[in-house]
Curated annotation (Swiss-Prot):
Function: May be involved in a process influencing telomere capping.
Ranges of biased composition (kind: Polar residues): 552-574, 734-743
InterPro entries from the UniProt entry: WD40/YVTN_repeat-like_dom_sf (IPR015943), WD40_repeat_CS (IPR019775), WD40_repeat_dom_sf (IPR036322), WD40_rpt (IPR001680), WDR24 (IPR037590), WDR59_RTC1-like_RING_Znf (IPR049566), Znf_RING (IPR001841)
Compositional bias ranges of the Basic and acidic residues kind: 791-813
GO annotation, biological process: positive regulation of macroautophagy; positive regulation of TORC1 signaling
Name of protein: Restriction of telomere capping protein 1
Localization: Vacuole
Amino acid sequence: MSSSTNGHSQSNFAKFAFNIYGTLSTTSSSTPQSHEISPSPSSSLSSSRSRRNKQSFRAATGHRLTYQCDKETISLSQLNYPLQVGGYGTELHSIVIGGKNYLRLLCISESQQRIIDDINLLESKSIYNSRVGSKLININTIKTYESTIATGLSNGVVSVYKISPNGQGKQTGRFSDHKRTINSLDFIESENQLLSGSQDGTIKLWDLRSSSSKPSITIQASMRSDPIRACQYSPHSSVKNKMCVLSVHDSGALCKFDLRSTGGNGNIYSPEKKWNLHTGPALSLHIHPEKEYVITGGRDQRISVFNYGEGQSNSSTPENTIITYGPVLKVRWSSYSNISQSGDEFEEAQSSLSPSKINPLYNYDIACSYLNDDPTVAIYNLSRKYVPKQIIHSKKPIQNFIWARNGHRDRNIWTLTKSNTFNSYNLDQIDEYDVSRPLDDLNNVAVAWDNNGNFSMANQDKYDFELDDNDIYDRPEGSSEAEVASHGMDPEESGNAIHFHNSATTSPVEKAALARSYTHNPMSAIQLPTKSPLPIGRNGTGFLGHDMSLPNISTRPKLTRNTSQTTQDSSVSYGSAYPIPQSANSNTTLHMKRNIISNSTKSSNTSAYVIPVVLPIVSNDEFVFKKLSSEYLVKLPDGFTMIDVCLLNASTAASVNSNRTCQVWRLLAVSLQEHFDSQKAPMTIEELEKQQMEQNENEEGVPNATVESATDSMPAKSVSSVLGNFVESYKTNSSFGTGSQINKPGKSVKSRTSSGVNLMDKINLASRTSSFSKTSFKFKEKEGVDEDGVPEDKEKQERGKAEDQETENDKKSIHSNQEPIVIRTTRHSKVEDLDDENLNIANSMAMKSSPTSVGISLPSSHTFSSSIASSPQPIRGQIPPKQQLATTRESPVHNWLDQKKNELFRGRNVVPAISGLSLALKSSNNGDEKLLTRAWKFKNLLRKSLDYAMLQGDVIFCSTAAILFYEFAEDTISEYEYLEWVSLYIDILQKKKLFVTAINILNSTAGSIKSKLQKIYSVDLDLRFYCSNCETLLVNEKSQMSQKGEFGYWYCDECNKLQSKCVYCNEPCKGLAVVVGLKCGHQGHFGCLKEWFIQDENMECPGGCDYQIL
């Protein structure tokens, strides 16, 4: 390809050939692309070549520079060397991109808005690439200096290229002394000396003028191989007659070498200084442009700012640390300072102060990219290190980035994504849609909860952050607040401000709606002129009856120091400056704005305040949480069923007075029992008669002496509904009708869903002592009226005789402890009344006859006669009295059937048969299942209980119920809800240091959920120990390399002191010894303390501190 042809002489073939190497597009123009692409389709070639002033360049920054590479790319750099390409003779900026068999030089314009030409440097002819032209070349890193380009390959080779003024490249050197991948390159003060750091743990210094292929100096941090991730020459050390090189390693250490302190063979085997700044591999470093500071980033999600100068050599901890949200892959200082540019209000306030009072590290921003396919680049500033200043968002993960140099000192960042796309971002451009500013989206007021249910509210102006009281708030001694507020303004404006304060505080009409925005200090020595509170000027709180023409100079009110922080110079307890309200006719200039910000910053005593709030929330009691979380059953013990677990959880909830949760667990147990019973096949009349005959035969053959034992041991053959037994237990609390009821104590009955103990009796026993027993649900027994409202005068006498006879035979019958259930005909024997047309009438009648019973539920099988059903009265209207219902005539056939039924099944427990209509509706697939779903089904009750618990924030109930019933009701509890509840529950348990309970919850989850949770919470721990004396990381590499004595971490190589000694034997605690720490602070071996306290029976600490242990 011809790279130096003129734009006027380009042909169509040249355009097609040029597109092979990538898309040189910076605009969305539909015109054909050429070697020179202008930012606008209407701009001509001649106009694009003309030089423009600064304003025209900034006006044309609406188009982003992008380039799509045709091969896999890894490395990125910038070449600042004048090239004469495409008819341009000015100083151009060039982009160097490297990858797999890829090394291109992209020539761009001075405005960095369009690409002039691209050059393939691998096609250059030389003696080095002619013999190995077909081999794979994988360029891992690139470094440039003037016209020299150095590349580090993945096979340990360093290649050097020279660029001529016409843009042609030629390979001039090839060095292959490294054994593994080259990770970092850097030039030393000129283009003739080159540093290379490799994965093999060595740094080599190359003399590019020499014909030898061997390095001049080889540097190694230790005898064992510690891979070098990055290395850089320090330009600030030449002033002190030194040549310092810094490097970071996989061990997390930062090493400092002096190239002039080499041995006789020209090699260095130990660093001059070494600092352990990271708890994992350190992946990047970059030296400050002006000071002897270095920033390092590592996989431990930290960015460390460290002073490596001679005066700070004894320091082992970084001066600043930025906690990021991911492992840091690359970190860079900005190319230009922020002093010359006009930024936001915070930077304006900082620049208005004295330069000597500003930290010089604040002048430069820090950019970092992240590991693990993160598509962002975060820009930080040490003045606000907790919140990113800006964030660049990319569609694909970012592979590499650099700060771009330009003639306008703009903050430009060039990125290279894993989709092989080059992008340029201008951080000074406001309308950059892929650059966000998190500080602008944050609120001034924030609320945070702690683990004990208390919360704190923080109130802070977003531009006032960590301002030094001694340096910035230099208020003159003896000056008043009003004088400080008006300081820096014109005398007329100052007088207006004070006049507003005197007038506004005396008028109750002009007082702001927000009465107090500050905290009163009772120790204040200065009294306000009036007793009315000071009005606060805010956006959104107007002042009635006020009309002033002051400029918009109101600042956000600030809170002063607390009583413990009050000094002689800060005795005023009210807000900073006396605020001035907004005016509708305000036109604030930039000079006025910066002046007011500067003076208001000086006048305030503090920039933020935190208000802790303690709320004794009953539902968030610490004791209740610990008891429920530790005693709730989340899995089935041996010999227990799901119903047993629900009842035990109900008793646990009742023990902490959580009555509603207790009743929910009981309700779920009853509903679950009914669900199991409904799965049984209904019994026909013939089966019931056969079973009854077998029972009569057994009764005749059993002696009277063994009746009681048989009752306890023989399994119950009755399969009556447990719901009937449950509601029958409440007959002693309320009644229906005028007749008496027969209540017999029943014994435990086993079913196939129980564990040998009648759990319903536990419910009845516990419910009688609770407030819920007064509103219990029960079946009514009509004694003067049958199911159709027909009188039973003739049957009363027969029933009375039968009851007397049954009372005498109670001791002989093994079924005497069970309540009789009347068997209805097919027309009345429906367990589930699906239409339920008479439920409201039955309930109304029950409420009228028994006003003291709050909740009465009648069986759905009650059917009234046609005379009642055809009544013109509405459902909720007045129901005829019971005597009127009793006079209704009944058919003879019904009387005959009831008589035969009572004679056959009197005193026997049977299961009501399900009607054919219900069976047909259940087996029909044409009906709507939603219409057939009953509200008291188990899954419906479970869903309603979970929804209510979510609204109440009951994470314990949600998590416990999800773990117990997820496999049973997968259609009710989704997998997302399961993961959300359980993961949140585990997080809370870990915050409360209930680690055993958290592990129990994790192990009790379902198999598919457990594997996902284990990836989050079951991770390997990387423990790092620090010296208790000098607070340095315990590495002890010196003693490990010397291999003398017993190696361990019970001593420190830096301060040569032991970490801990036994208070009893005064020997170091090392090895696998168990160390016990006492409350007084002393510690010792477990065996020593056991001998002191247990065998010798001492009560005080053996260290002589007179602390009574027992």
